[in-house]
A protein has these predicted regions:
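Charged, low-complexity surface segments at secondary-structure and domain boundaries
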Residues: 1-4, 95, 183-184
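Short, flexible active-site-proximal loops enriched in glycine and acidic residues
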Residues: 83-92
């Protein structure tokens, strides 16, 4: 198996990185802070992704998508994770992935085209005692996929009571969602296959968080001096950076394998997806925490940018089950 990117995949990666780098030059994390404090998404970035057709990159062409695969979606999620894009891209593609794999032909024909075009946003929540307490992207969602006891149902946002809630990561909206009694339609297809592909997308965003945290940290410890020398020259700091690199690459390898399996060998996907999500969840939290420590006293301040990565990692790591849950599942699959 070859995990190297094709020319077309590299072009997607280059285009995404260039687009997001241009927006970073225009405002960087300062712009991110503005959107977070205003509790609104970056609508201009959403518009640009719509024009590129990236909301439907992994959806079949007959539903308005680009007909590519999990590898291409993984590339995009990683780049958006690097930039901490304040848009509901991940929640929307998670929901559309579940609808594609678990929905009926009629449900796919009706629900996927507006999600593929970005005309509508979507989100995924886990119900407990009749409500989903933390639905990322719920504030902008037109469509919701709610999971409960191994089943999923899809319903319009109008059939739910949505209340915005505070969240550790304010770069995307979070909501408590309570569906009306009996509302929604069951998704009775391949829900496990959809959930596994959703785990790969989340893991990909976490890899992007790792990569950006490592990049910012290495740049900082090269420039920051104590006693006349860069702090990165001290073994305690350089060893920490080396461990951050190892954690990042371990998560990247596991996630690349899972994305490949989703497209090329679905029988391997359940174990690969659990392994990727577990590895990426732990790596992102550890790497971003190490990044804060490597930045010294300033790393703990609100004015520093590095804390945004830590907050995103904590939230994404918990989505659809954290590392402990994924390892338990992996053990059961062996």
């Amino acid at each position: 198996m070859d995990f190297g990117l094709s020319d077309d995949q590299r072009e997607i990666q280059r285009t995404a990185r260039a687009l997001l780098a241009e927006r970073a030059r225009a405002g960087g994390f300062s712009s991110l802070r503005e959107h977070a404090e205003a509790r609104r998404p970056d609508r201009e970035l959403w518009r640009e992704l719509r024009e590129l057709g990236w909301l439907g990159i992994a959806l079949p062409e007959r539903y308005g998508g680009q007909g590519l695969g999990s590898v291409e979606l993984s590339i995009l999620c990683e780049e958006l994770g690097r930039s901490l894009a304040p848009i509901p891209f991940l929640p929307t593609v998670l929901a559309s992935t579940l609808i594609e794999h678990a929905g009926s032909d009629e449900q796919r024909e009706r629900l996927l085209p507006p999600l593929a075009s970005g005309e509508q946003g979507a989100a995924v929540g886990v119900l407990s005692e009749g409500r989903a307490e933390l639905v990322i992207g719920g504030g902008e969602a037109h469509v919701l996929v709610l999971l409960e006891d191994g089943r999923a149902r899809v319903l319009p946002a109008g059939q739910t009571d949505i209340t915005l809630v505070a969240c550790i990561d304010p770069t995307r909206s979070a909501a408590e969602v309570t569906p009306a009694e009996g509302a929604g339609e069951l998704l009775e297809g391949d829900l496990p296959g959809g959930l596994d592909r959703a785990l790969v997308a989340i893991a990909s965003e976490l890899v992007g968080v790792c990569d950006r945290a490592l990049e910012l940290t290495v740049a900082y410890v090269k420039e920051r001096k104590q006693f006349g020398v860069p702090v990165g020259s001290y073994q305690a700091v350089s060893h920490r950076c080396a461990q951050m690199l190892l954690d990042t690459e371990r998560a990247r390898s596991a996630t690349a394998y899972a994305a490949w399996a989703a497209d090329a060998d679905p029988e391997r996907l359940p174990r690969a997806a659990a392994m990727a999500k577990a590895s990426a969840s732990e790596a992102a939290v550890d790497v971003s925490a190490s990044a804060i420590q490597a930045h010294g006293g300033i790393g703990f301040t609100w004015e520093a940018d590095i804390h945004w990565l830590y907050k995103r990692s904590l939230l994404d790591a918990a989505l659809l089950g954290g590392a402990k849950r994924q390892r338990a599942r992996l053990a059961a699959l062996l």
